[in-house]
Curated annotation (Swiss-Prot):
Protein name in the entry: HTH-type transcriptional repressor FatR
Lineage: superkingdom: Bacteria
Classification via PROSITE patterns: HTH_TETR_1, HTH_TETR_2
Biological role: Negatively regulates the transcription of the fatR-cypB operon. Is displaced from its operator by a range of fatty acids such as oleate, linoleate and phytanate, thereby allowing transcription of the fatR-cypB operon.
Species: Bacillus subtilis (strain 168)
PANTHER family: ACREF/ENVCD OPERON REPRESSOR-RELATED, ACREF_ENVCD OPERON REPRESSOR-RELATED
Amino acid sequence: MISASSSKYDMIMKASVSLFTERGFDATTIPMIAERAHVGTGTIYRYFDSKETLVNVLFQESIQRFTEKLKQDVSELPVREGFHHVFCCLVQFTKESDYALFFLETKKDAHYLNHTSKKMIENLTQMLDDYFNKGKAEGVIRSLPSNVLIAIVLGAFLKIYQLVQTGDIEMDTDLITELEQCCWDAIKLHSSQK
């Protein structure tokens, strides 16, 4: 059985990530979070001393969950297999939390992130950078900067996922497979480019 305090914490976190994603950090207030989470404002302050603390805990938990999904160093896998692994992790992560991936992407350079949050995203970005550098060195991935390659893949994935959230398309196995292949085709070095 889930304790009431654990349940309240979870409700606060879910309400926070959705509001921060929808409205942004500055336009979201603690009373709005409390209303959406169906808890009192004071309850939020029992867990977090400020909105900045709340957003950093949320950010760090999201980064940690995604990093745990990756589990292994993708730079040690064959390049195409590493891409498949990262892509599957993106799919799993968004299925578990509709807003978490959007939150991580839109807030990664935010002024209110503390040192720990910035360090965690830096570590994740470095892991992906190592993977892309390996692929570029092996002549498998285009020689674009890693942040551009990440933007190509993540941008396409996030836009498709927005269409899923609005009900415009259904995310099924065939779509996931085709989307992965499209993203891979966008970043791989084609034989005519060598």
